[in-house]
Each structure stands twice: as C-alpha cells, then as structure tokens.
Regions:
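Acidic, low-complexity terminal tails and accessory targeting/binding regions
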Residues: 81-93, 140-143, 148-159, 174-228
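Loop-to-helix element that buttresses phosphate recognition and phosphoryl-transfer chemistry
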Residues: 4, 9-64, 116-130
Length: 228
C-alpha cells in the first residue's frame, strides 16, 4: 500500500492585511497546485484522493482530482490544528507577534497549542484516530496490540493521495513511522507548499510496516516557486 501526502499550495493568509483562519490559495498557490497535479500521473494508478475540508487543501486537491479522474473525498480529521477564533480578522502583524510569543513558552506549555486554539494533544489524537479509521475502511488494520506500528495490509497495490497540511501530514508521517509525538511536528517534518511525501508498506515478519520513501519533493516547481 502506498500513501502519498501532498501539502496544500501557498495560501493568501491576509489578503487585506487582516488574518484569515481558513484562507484560499494565493495566485502562486494555485500555480503550485496545477504543477503538482500535472505530475500526478507519475505516481502510478491512484485508487482514492482524500482531502482536508479547508479551502487551501480543497483548492490544491481539485486539479489533482481532475488529473486522476477521481473526485476528492473530504476527511474532516485532516483539518489543520485550529487557530484561536479571535485571530480571524486580526491585523497580520499581531498574529506574527503572537506566534513569536507562543514559541518562547516553556516546552511543556507547547502541548497546549496556541492560547485559545486547539491543543496539540487534541489535534494529534484527532488526526491519528481519523487516519486509523480511514485505513480500516480500506481493510488496513493494526497487526495486534503488541505491535501498534505493524499492519495487516490486504492489498499491497492500493495507492491513496491525501491533500492536507504541514501539521496534519507531519502527524501522519510520525505516527506511521512509530515516532514519539512532539508538539513541533511541523518542524520535524517540514514540507514546502505542494511538497510530496510517499510512504509505502513493506513486509516485516507477518505484518507490514510503513517506510518513508520520498519527502518534501517539489521537483514539479521551478526553484523560484518553492515556498514554505
């Protein structure tokens, strides 16, 4: 089984200098999305395209759906960690300062997420539980309780694309590789906009384990188009 993770294109975070919690893609972001869709045929036959419900993920998934002939399916669990509600419409400079202040807190406080937003603990649990449930619908289940990172995979030829976010995709990668979670997953697995990661299963004893084969691939972009 192969899981292909695509981060969304560059968003227009503050089109009028005021922040948006669920922004649309920028002009460059739309171009990045069209470029990654243009190379989807190189990934091999795709069975399903999944996407986060956020605008930037939907708008990145749309051309991939057109390229593959598949209708992207919304998975609510793939939503990025939720920003504080009060950030919506706030001056962008205030948001930048809030990020700086939040990152200066003690490490133990980082698990609480941004003040007023979703905690990292809740975010991690949401993504992992949603991922495990989505895989189960494909018949992919954990081998047993003693080996949580080994899986029963009935069809090694399955291939699924998930279009989501830096945080969501990082949690997915960390969990499938068996890495201990940290509240800085975004930095541990930092992917550029429309960066592609590919995880595939390989035989380990009587089960299958996920192996990270490609990460942060932006070969579909010109160098000046690469953004983080």
């Amino acid at each position: 089984m192969e899981l292909i993770l695509v981060r969304h294109g560059l968003p227009d975070w503050a089109p009028d200098s005021f922040a948006r919690n669920d922004p649309h893609l920028s002009e460059l972001g739309n171009l990045q999305a069209s470029r990654v869709a243009a190379v989807a045929d190189r990934w091999g036959p795709i069975d399903e395209v999944w996407m986060s419900p956020m605008h930037r993920a939907r708008e990145t998934a749309a051309p991939i759906g057109e390229s593959t002939g598949l209708a992207p399916v919304v998975h609510p669990w793939a939503y990025e960690i939720r920003n504080p509600d009060q950030w919506e419409g706030s001056p962008i400079e205030e948001i930048k300062n809030a990020w700086i202040d939040a990152n200066l807190r003690p490490i133990s406080d980082l698990w609480d997420g941004l003040p007023g937003g979703e905690t990292f603990r809740d975010f991690h649990q949401r993504v992992v539980e949603g991922l495990v449930g989505a895989l189960a619908e494909l018949g992919i289940t954990r081998l047993d309780d003693g080996h949580p990172h080994l899986w029963n995979v009935p069809d090694d030829d399955q291939r699924v694309v998930l279009v989501a976010h830096g945080g969501t995709n990082a949690v997915v990668i960390g969990h499938l590789l068996g890495a201990e979670p940290t509240p800085w997953e975004w930095d541990r697995f930092e992917s550029p906009h429309t960066g592609v990661a590919r995880l595939s299963t390989l035989a380990i004893a009587h089960g299958r384990a996920f192996s990270l084969r490609v990460f942060g691939d932006v070969s579909h972009l010109d160098p000046e188009m690469v953004t983080k």
